[in-house]
Amino acid sequence: MEKVTIAAFGGSLRSKSYNGYLLKTASKNVPEGVDFKIAPIRNLPMYNTDEEENPSEAVVNFKNVLRDADGILVVTPEYNYSIPGFIKNAIDIASRPYSDNVLKGKHVAVMSASIGAFGGMRAQYHLRQVFVYLDMKQINKPEVFINFAQDKFDPNGELRDEKSLLLIQELMKKLAAECRLSRKSLPV
């Protein structure tokens, strides 16, 4: 089986966030033959076009992890019915300048967790709009919205909900499979 690389970013800036736990859960549930890497976002500066020609080390490292990946996983909280600023900032950095958009054409999957009833779905829908513009290949199903996350993760961040775990595993399998198919269709 050909090895593929999936790079992930997101979670939350908060140390004990449910989305951080979700990112950790996804990392433990990748199918065989997947190299899973975290693209570091904590030290990214705010996106500024003035800095495109001389990016910081944090920007270079972040973009290189994404550039080298076959697929991308974004794990997002929902703030005020939308995408948190740090997630949008990371996407802006990864996609600019347009001549160095490391997201274009990549397969992408998204997951979210929330203490509310909707599990972050509104943030996911906004992300999906952004992904269309960036010409990313979205894995649309299964949708992984973990609602009432406080009841589904234990105090150590371990996911206790079997249905959610199965959805995560299925989404990771689909993302990996689509990445493999794309590799096979590339001209030699």
Feature locations, PLM:
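Secondary-structure boundary/capping motif
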Residues: S15-Y18, Y47, S82-I83, G119-G120
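A generic structural motif
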Residues: P31-K37, M136-K137
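Glycine-rich phosphate/pyrophosphate-binding loop and the adjoining helix
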Residues: A7, K137-V188
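Short connector loops at secondary-structure junctions
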Residues: K37-P45, V144-Q150
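N-terminal beta1-alpha1 ligand-phosphate binding loop
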Residues: E2-G33
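Helix-loop-strand module that forms the ligand-binding subsite of alpha/beta enzymes
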Residues: S56-D135
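N-terminal beta-loop-helix "entrance" segment that forms/cooperates
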Residues: I41-E57, F153
